[in-house]
Curated annotation (Swiss-Prot):
Key word Cytoplasm present: yes
Organism of provenance: Lactobacillus johnsonii (strain CNCM I-12250 / La1 / NCC 533)
Family of this protein: Belongs to the thymidylate synthase family. Bacterial-type ThyA subfamily.
UniProtKB keywords: Cytoplasm, Methyltransferase, Nucleotide biosynthesis, Transferase
Catalytic activity: dUMP + (6R)-5,10-methylene-5,6,7,8-tetrahydrofolate = 7,8-dihydrofolate + dTMP
Protein name: Thymidylate synthase
GO process annotations (BP): dTMP biosynthetic process; dTTP biosynthetic process; methylation
Enzyme kind, highest EC tier: transferase
Subunit and partners: Homodimer.
Taxonomic lineage from the root: Bacteria, Bacillati, Bacillota, Bacilli, Lactobacillales
Active site: C200 (nucleophile)
Subcellular location: Cytoplasm
Function field: Catalyzes the reductive methylation of 2'-deoxyuridine-5'-monophosphate (dUMP) to 2'-deoxythymidine-5'-monophosphate (dTMP) while utilizing 5,10-methylenetetrahydrofolate (mTHF) as the methyl donor and reductant in the reaction, yielding dihydrofolate (DHF) as a by-product. This enzymatic reaction provides an intracellular de novo source of dTMP, an essential precursor for DNA biosynthesis.
Coiled coil: none
Pathway(s) it belongs to: Pyrimidine metabolism; dTTP biosynthesis
Length: 318
């Protein structure tokens, strides 16, 4: 086993020292670099951060959600996963049907105003509960549009019908493993305006060599403190699942980023993280009785010997 997160820590440090300060869509402000890359050898363990606790259950449920082709947060809420809540909640509070307290700019306001934060949390709790209990409401306001699950599994064709990119690429890996077309794309320009959040991890490509399966991800935009650690673990898990179905060994995960940024209200958290010492990476366990990607459930995926530091909380920029 080895310490796998050093490329991530090095990139955080580089952005803090060499990054460009910019304004951004959320109004928070960032420090960013353009065109960064991290490489993780999956033979050395599973690349989940140890310098802070990463809730692996959230990563599992989100990836399984994508792989189901699901775009409704109801499945996530059933697994106590609130990663995507804010995006669905935004659709609700901006609708004509919403009659509650003013939730304009709820992301920033909840950070600055304790009383508003309390009201916001109450409204969010009511929203989540209604998504879980009311099927009609869930279909209307729990759906995030054509996000990852839709593009991966149900890419709409102009002439009608859809393309299942995940099944297609698995079939290609089995039949023509040395193809240079082992690609899945989540970026559909026609759907970008109607998505709750246009895809950040835009495209990934598989590569087979010496019986090993590697994957390179291109991510157009990466929230380095909150989002990217999840993306690293999620795509490392995806490589392992696809390798299982295709009879290959996991090779390398290469993470290429366009705008790799740290939000200004995460600077203190980043400094705290960089002062911590990393532990050895854990190992990934997959149920040996499962082979097909579509058959895996939460209980079939576990981390062994995941030793980590404590959680570091930081606000989400919406």
């Amino acid at each position: 086993m080895a310490t796998l997160e050093q490329p991530y820590l090095d990139l955080l440090s580089k952005i803090m020292s060499e990054g460009h300060d910019k304004e951004d869509r959320t109004g928070t402000g960032t420090r960013s670099l353009f065109g960064a890359q991290m490489r993780f050898d999956l033979n050395d363990g599973f690349p989940i951060l140890t310098t802070k606790k990463i809730p692996f259950g959230l990563i599992k449920s989100e990836l399984l959600w994508f792989l189901r082709g699901d775009t409704n947060i109801r499945f996530l809420l059933e697994h106590n996963n609130h990663i995507w809540d804010e995006w669905a909640f935004k659709n609700w509070v901006e609708s004509n049907e919403y009659q509650g307290p003013d939730m304009t700019n709820f992301g920033l306001r909840s950070q600055q105003d304790p009383e508003f934060k309390r009201i916001y949390q109450e409204e969010m709790k009511k929203f989540d509960q209604k998504v879980l209990e009311d099927q009609t409401f869930a279909e209307k306001y729990g759906n995030l549009g054509d996000v990852y699950g839709a593009q991966w599994r149900h890419w709409q064709k102009r002439e009608g019908g859809f393309i299942d990119q995940i099944q297609n690429v698995i079939d290609q890996i089995k039949k023509t493993p040395y193809s240079r077309r082992l690609i899945v794309s989540a970026w559909n320009p026609e759907d970008v305006p109607t998505s709750a959040l246009p895809p950040c991890h835009v495209l990934f490509q598989f590569y087979v060599n010496d019986g090993c399966l590697s994957l390179q991800l291109y991510q157009r935009s990466g929230d380095m403190f909150l989002g990217v650690p999840f993306n690293i673990a999620s795509y490392a898990l995806l490589v392992n699942l696809v390798a299982r179905e295709t009879g290959l060994k996991p090779g390398e995960f290469i993470h290429t980023l366009g705008d790799a940024h740290i939000y200004k209200n995460h600077f203190n958290q980043v400094k705290e993280l960089l002062n911590r010492s990393a532990y050895d990476a854990p190992m990934l366990w997959l149920n040996p009785d499962k082979k097909l990607v579509q058959d895996f459930e939460m209980k079939d995926i576990k981390l062994i010997n995941y030793r980590h530091h404590g959680t570091i909380k930081a606000p989400v920029a919406v």
